């Protein structure tokens, strides 16, 4: 990125002090995103410099004195150092330079603004060095945010202990490298403090007792430091308004030499608004007693994991009726899982793993309607898996491994159709693998682990329906029979472990043809015959283990076998070949060359039969296309001419509305023609889509088709048509003007000078698009396949609601998968329709002569999701990587996604939300990647339908609402206070 090389703020000051009369001063600014274009253009064209400054982007002046009182140039990708000359803005109340790339140190001169400055935000930059103690002079400061920089050294005492301590409400120094203690002594009274965010530093010492004076505190986050001492019970007891308390990953202990948690829980009894409590990773000792019932009924999340808490889980925890997350994992808890947990009807995630819990899993857990994750792994639980788990329709991850569970795998688990992970490994389960489970869990997309049990019988053929699953582990059981060749249908499979069973017969070659398989272990079975060549020819296989079978034949050291050692073939005495340590093969006699023509003739005949017949059939099939009657389209157009819903607009009215289709009104162009913005006589703002006369013959069918679809469909997420205008040589669609342009402009703001969206907005937009396309596929009066879904065809209204547009190449669908063309539309088997759509978004089957289907739109939507997360256009990936966006993302999934998720988070990170929400944001981004990969699978039949996709996007949208906003102290409130 080309960062600014000039101090932007310094330039502002030189202009204000009328030192900017030199014509070339504006040329010193390197402004890569053109974020400050108004500064440059106005300073070079206007004679009244002072007035111009007040009109500049990010600048606000006092209306009476025209003195600059606010400077907010946050989130504009600016760089350079912050100039000390900022102190010359003596009337400044708000200074916000956050979310840029400023480097260097914080100028101590900012402290001279003590008479006026109320809000200072320098967060999310690259600033380093110490925090200047001069900032302690800012005695009117209300809001201080220096978080997410590279600051080091100790926190200056003056920052907390001076005149400003009476006014400071918000302090964020988080995510730096600050050391030393929290500098609060008995003389410091931060009485107005509501937010204290010091997480992810290197702070030591105890929580200062004088913090108890901050009785208005709502949010205290000291997580991920090196703080020590007893949990600050006396401090917390004086904070009745506390809503969020994060003390995880420090070195705190409980009372009475780390044996008693009771005083701390008692101190929280006054905090009736408490919503989240996190104490994880402190090695806290003690028990969770019945006093937990006195905690706030508003509690939503409790994190007590990674401690040394012992005793049982008190049934009284069921009094916390609003709890959605309970994490007690990695402790020393014993006793049974309380049945009373079923009273927590809002529970979504329960983590009880890695404890010493005993008894049976309560069947009542199956009555928690929203439960999406249950992890009770690594305990001493016994008994059977409850049948009631089949009631958990929202269950996505079920982890029961590492217990002493017995009985069979319940068939009812097949009802948990949203399961992504099922891990029942390392138990004492018996019986066969239920057909009802594997046949219904088609959506299982992460892993299935049934290893280390006593399961018997064959692998059900229905397992092959799991075409989304990434990993299957059935090892260390008593399974028998053949390995089904149908497992080759699990096309997403990357890891397959069938070792230590009783499988016999030959190894199916279809496993070697799995396109993403990386690891295969079939050791310790009774497999016979040769290793199929497909395994050696695989380009993805990295780890193979064929040991201790009865395999025979020649093994080459070529292809995927080139990096294998003899350890992959131990105990297979009948194998020979060129692997180091393996016995060499005996030479075979060569057949006379006279047999070669005979063999070729025997092979050629069936090949011609196999490949020739489909070609003949395909040519016949192309002649039997069903088409829409041309008369139907024309009759409909005549009928709509008198429809009051579509007012008639003359050609002259459109000329007047668009200024004669002036170039200044042009807002877009494409193959079909041009789009102009305009204003009708009733002040309606419109977009006029005009068909180019030069291409009228070629695209007239597209024009009619778009008219037809827009008039027949109505949905809040589809563009509506105002009317049409046609005359000889002129065809136009009149549509509402979308003030926020296309999604493409927001995904690539550097190209279009648009503001970035955030993750919440993007998920809402994708949810809107999915709803719109689902309507077209399943509920529209005429079923429609869009065929060209991409960011530029998604428009955003003034409320950032997404509307799908551009139906010029859509197909009308008559049956479930039967495409019916309009008068000029043909199958994708024709030259005209072969690659109908946009490169990078076109489903691969369209390039092989397949007809338009709803699966193609699902593919395009998946590409859209992957594009949003990766920040890369699919065409860029094709050019630079030589692969599709799906293949690019698949190569990073799941182990190498951290960098991609980090970059996505840096681009789309929501503002005005606590850093604590980052865990949730990462999960949402990961799920967007997973959904994108599922939607872009090569085989169309394995993709979900758009109703399922819309449901998933709706769930992610609701999931994001779980993260609270900064409750009281919004930036608007701060600015309002600053300007008062």
From Swiss-Prot:
Enzyme Commission number(s) from the entry: 2.7.11.1
UniProt modified residues of type Phosphotyrosine: 775, 841
Ranges of the LRR repeats in the UniProt entry: 65-89, 90-113, 115-138, 139-162, 165-189, 191-214, 215-238, 240-263, 271-295, 296-320, 322-344, 345-370, 372-391, 392-416, 417-440, 442-463, 464-490, 491-514, 515-537, 539-563
Entry keyword set: ATP-binding, Cell membrane, Glycoprotein, Kinase, Leucine-rich repeat, Membrane, Nucleotide-binding, Phosphoprotein, Receptor, Repeat, Serine/threonine-protein kinase, Signal, Transferase, Transmembrane, Transmembrane helix
Transmembrane segments: 594-614
Key word Disulfide bond present: no
A GO cellular component annotation in the UniProt record: plasma membrane
Record has Glycoprotein as a keyword: yes
Extracellular-side segments: 21-593
Catalytic activity: L-seryl-[protein] + ATP = O-phospho-L-seryl-[protein] + ADP + H(+); L-threonyl-[protein] + ATP = O-phospho-L-threonyl-[protein] + ADP + H(+)
Signal sequence segment: 1-20
Ligand binding (ATP): 667-675, 689
Entry protein name: Putative leucine-rich repeat receptor-like serine/threonine-protein kinase At2g24130
Organism: Arabidopsis thaliana (Mouse-ear cress)
């Amino acid at each position: 990125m080309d960062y600014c090389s000039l101090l932007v703020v310094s330039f502002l000051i030189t202009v204000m002090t009328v030192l900017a009369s030199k014509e070339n001063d504006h040329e010193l600014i390197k402004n890569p995103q053109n974020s400050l274009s108004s500064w440059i253009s106005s300073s070079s064209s206007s004679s009244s410099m002072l007035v111009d400054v007040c009109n500049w982007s990010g600048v606000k002046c006092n209306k009476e004195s025209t003195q600059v009182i606010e400077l907010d140039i946050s989130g504009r990708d600016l760089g350079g150092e912050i100039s000390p000359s900022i102190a010359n803005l003596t009337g400044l109340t708000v200074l916000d330079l956050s979310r840029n790339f400023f480097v260097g140190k914080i100028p101590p001169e900012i402290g001279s603004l003590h008479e006026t400055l109320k809000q200072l935000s320098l967060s999310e930059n690259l600033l380093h060095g110490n925090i200047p103690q001069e900032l302690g002079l800012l005695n009117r400061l209300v809001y201080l945010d220096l978080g997410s920089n590279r600051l080091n050294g100790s926190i200056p005492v003056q920052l907390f202990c001076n005149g400003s301590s009476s006014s400071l409400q918000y302090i964020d120094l988080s995510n730096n490298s600050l050391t030393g203690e929290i500098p609060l002594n008995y003389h410091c009274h931060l009485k107005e403090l509501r937010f204290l965010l010091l997480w992810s530093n290197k702070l030591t010492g105890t929580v200062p007792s004088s913090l108890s004076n901050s009785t208005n505190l709502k949010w205290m986050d000291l997580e991920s430091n090196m703080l020590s001492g007893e949990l600050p019970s006396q401090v917390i007891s004086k904070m009745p308004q506390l809503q969020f308390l994060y003390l995880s990953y420090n070195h705190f202990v409980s009372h009475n030499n780390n044996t008693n948690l009771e005083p701390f829980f008692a101190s929280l009894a006054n905090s009736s608004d408490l919503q989240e409590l996190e104490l994880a990773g402190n090695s806290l000792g003690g028990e969770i007693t019945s006093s937990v019932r006195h905690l706030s009924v508003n509690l939503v999340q409790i994190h007590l994991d990674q401690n040394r808490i012992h005793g049982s889980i008190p049934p009284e925890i069921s009094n916390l009726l609003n709890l959605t997350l309970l994490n007690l994992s990695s402790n020393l808890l014993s006793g049974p899982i309380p049945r009373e947990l079923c009273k927590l009807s809002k529970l979504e995630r329960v983590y009880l793993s890695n404890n010493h819990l005993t008894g049976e899993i309560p069947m009542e857990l199956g009555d928690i309607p929203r439960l999406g994750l249950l992890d009770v792994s690594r305990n001493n639980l016994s008994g059977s898996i409850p049948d009631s788990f089949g009631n958990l329709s929202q269950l996505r991850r079920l982890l029961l491994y590492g217990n002493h569970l017995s009985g069979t795998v319940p068939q009812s688990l097949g009802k948990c159709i949203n399961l992504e992970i099922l891990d029942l490994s390392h138990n004492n389960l018996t019986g066969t693998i239920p057909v009802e489970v594997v046949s219904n869990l088609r959506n299982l997309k992460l892993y299935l682990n049934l290893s280390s049990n006593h399961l018997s019988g064959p692998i059900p053929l229905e397992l092959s329906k799991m075409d989304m699953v990434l990993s299957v582990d059935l090892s260390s059981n008593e399974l028998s029979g053949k390995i089904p060749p149908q497992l080759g249908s699990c096309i997403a499979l990357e890891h397959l472990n069938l070792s230590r069973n009783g499988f016999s017969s030959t190894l199916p070659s279809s496993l070697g043809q799995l396109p993403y398989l990386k690891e295969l272990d079939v050791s310790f079975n009774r497999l016979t015959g040769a290793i199929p060549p497909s395994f050696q020819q695989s380009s993805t296989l990295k780890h193979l283990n064929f040991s201790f079978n009865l395999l025979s034949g020649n093994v080459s050291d070529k292809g995927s076998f080139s990096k294998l050692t003899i350890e992959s073939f131990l105990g297979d005495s009948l194998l020979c070949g060129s692997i180091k340590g393996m016995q060499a093969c005996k030479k075979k006699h060569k057949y006379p060359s006279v047999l070669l023509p005979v063999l070729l003739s025997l092979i050629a005949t069936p090949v011609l039969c196999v490949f020739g017949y489909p070609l003949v059939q395909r040519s016949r099939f192309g002649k039997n296309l069903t088409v829409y009657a041309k008369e139907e389209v024309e009759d409909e157009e005549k009928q709509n001419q008198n429809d009051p819903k579509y007012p008639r607009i003359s050609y002259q009215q459109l000329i007047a509305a668009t200024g004669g289709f002036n170039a200044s009104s042009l807002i877009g162009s494409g193959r079909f023609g041009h789009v102009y913005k305009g204003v009708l006589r009733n002040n309606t703002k419109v977009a006029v889509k005009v068909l180019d006369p030069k291409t009228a013959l070629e695209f007239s069918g597209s024009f009619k088709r778009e008219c037809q679809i827009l008039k027949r469909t109505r949905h809040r997420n589809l563009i509506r048509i105002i009317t049409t205008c046609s005359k000889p040589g002129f065809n136009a669609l009149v549509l509402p003007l979308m003030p926020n342009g296309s999604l493409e402009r927001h995904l690539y703001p550097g190209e279009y000078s648009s503001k970035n969206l955030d993750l919440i907005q993007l998920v809402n937009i994708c949810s809107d698009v999915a709803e719109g396309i689902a309507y077209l596929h399943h509920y529209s009066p005429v079923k429609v396949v869009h065929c060209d879904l991409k960011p530029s065809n998604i428009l955003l209204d003034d409320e950032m609601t997404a509307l799908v547009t551009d139906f010029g190449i859509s197909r009308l669908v008559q049956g479930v998968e039967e495409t019916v063309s309009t008068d000029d539309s043909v199958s994708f088997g024709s030259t005209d329709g072969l690659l109908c759509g946009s490169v990078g978004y076109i489903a691969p089957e369209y390039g092989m002569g397949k007809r338009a289907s709803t699966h193609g739109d699902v593919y395009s939507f998946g590409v859209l999701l992957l594009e949003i997360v990766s920040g890369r256009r699919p065409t860029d990936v094709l050019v630079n990587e030589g692969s599709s966006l799906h293949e690019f993302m698949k190569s990073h999934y799941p182990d190498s996604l951290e960098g991609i998720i980090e970059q996505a988070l840096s681009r789309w990170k929501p503002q005005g939300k606590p850093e604590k929400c980052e865990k949730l944001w990462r999960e949402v981004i990961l799920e967007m990647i997973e959904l994108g990969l599922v939607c872009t699978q090569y085989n169309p039949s394995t993709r979900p339908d758009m109703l399922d996709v819309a449901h998933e996007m709706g769930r992610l949208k609701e999931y994001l609402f779980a993260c609270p906003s900064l409750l009281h102290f919004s930036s608007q409130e701060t600015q309002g206070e600053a300007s008062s």
